[in-house]
Design a protein with these regions (language model features):
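Core catalytic region of metal-dependent phosphoesterases/phosphodiesterases
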Residues: 2, 11-103
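Conserved histidine-centered catalytic loops in small-molecule metabolism enzymes
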Residues: 231-239
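Active-site-proximal loop/helix segment associated with metal-binding centers of metalloenzymes
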Residues: 109-171
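Conserved beta-sheet core of the metallophosphoesterase superfamily
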Residues: 94-97, 103, 107, 112, ...
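N-terminal short leaders/motifs
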Residues: 42-63, 156-184
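Short acidic/polar alpha-helix capping motifs at helix-coil junctions
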Residues: 25-28, 65, 137-143, 181
Length: 239
C-alpha cells in the first residue's frame, strides 16, 4: 500500500504558492499512490458547503481531478470542521472521523484532541462541534458566516499569542492513552505545526506533520515504512 498523508495547509487563496503546490502535488501523486489522507485544516476557514468563493471553486476542481485517480480521505481540523456531505459528494473525497484507523496498527487524527492542557481550546472545540451550534450557524447567511469566521481567526491568533507554548503541544499522557486504547503501533497527526518523528514507550512511533508555511510537508507510507518529507513551496512540486 502506497499512502500519502498531509495536514495544516491552511489554504485561503487559489493563487498562493501553497495552493499551487497542493494542486501540483495532487496531480503528480494521485497517479502514483493508492490513497491520500488530508488530516485536517486543509483550508484556513470553511463556513459551509455553499461557499462559492474562488478558493472553494478551485479546491473542488483540484480534488475532483485527484479522486478520479486515487482515493482521497479528508478529516476535519479545527478550521474546516464544517466540511459536510455536500462537499464530499461534489469533490469525491471520503470524510473520515478523528481517530481513524486505516490499518489495525495505524492511527490517524488531526491532533487537537491531544492538546488536553489547553482547556480553553477544548471547551471551545466542544461547543463548535455541537450539533445545535452548527445547525444555528449554518442557518445564517453566507456573509454572516464569513464575518464570524474572520473574527474567529483574529481572536484565535490573539489568544494563542498569549498562551504558553507547552499547553498548545500534544500531551504525553493523551498520546499514550489513544495509542493504547486503539492498539496502534504508529500515530500520525498534525495541528501543532511541530513536524518530527518521535518514539513512544520505546516500541511505538508518533509522526507529526508540519504546516505548509516555510515548506510543504508530507508523510509517505510504502508497505510498513514511513518517511517524513519536506519540499519547497517556491518552485513547482517535484522539481
Amino acid at each position: 500500500m502506497h499512502r500519502l498523508f498531509m495536514s495544516d495547509l491552511h489554504l485561503d487563496d487559489p493563487t498562493s504558492s501553497q495552493f499551487l503546490r497542493f494542486n501540483e502535488c495532487l496531480t503528480s501523486e494521485a497517479a502514483e499512490v493508492d490513497e491520500i489522507y488530508i488530516l485536517g485544516d486543509l483550508v484556513e476557514m470553511w463556513v459551509g458547503d455553499d461557499d462559492d468563493s474562488p478558493l472553494a471553486q478551485a479546491l473542488t476542481q483540484s480534488l475532483n481531478n485527484a479522486t478520479a485517480r486515487c482515493s482521497v480521505f479528508l478529516m476535519h481540523g479545527n478550521r474546516d470542521f464544517l466540511f459536510k456531505d455536500r462537499f464530499a459528494e461534489r469533490t469525491g473525497v471520503c470524510l473520515i472521523e478523528d481517530m481513524h484507523q486505516p490499518d489495525p496498527n495505524l492511527l490517524l487524527c488531526h491532533g487537537d484532541l491531544l492538546c488536553t492542557d489547553d482547556t480553553e481550546y477544548q471547551a471551545l472545540r466542544k461547543q463548535l462541534r455541537g450539533v445545535q451550534w452548527q445547525q444555528e450557524f449554518l442557518a445564517q447567511s453566507l456573509a454572516e458566516r464569513r464575518a464570524f469566521g474572520e473574527d474567529l481567526r483574529r481572536r484565535s491568533k490573539q489568544e494563542n499569542a498569549n498562551k504558553a507554548e507547552s499547553i498548545m503541544d500534544a500531551n504525553t499522557e493523551a498520546i499514550t492513552e489513544v495509542m493504547t486504547h486503539n492498539s496502534a503501533q504508529t500515530l500520525i497527526h498534525g495541528h501543532t505545526h511541530r513536524p518530527g518523528l518521535h518514539q513512544v514507550n520505546e516500541n511505538k512511533n508518533r509522526i507529526v506533520l508540519g504546516a505548509w508555511e516555510g515548506c510543504g510537508w508530507l508523510c509517505r507510507q510504502q508497505t510498513e515504512e514511513f518517511e517524513l518529507e519536506c519540499f519547497s513551496l517556491a518552485r513547482r512540486y517535484g522539481t
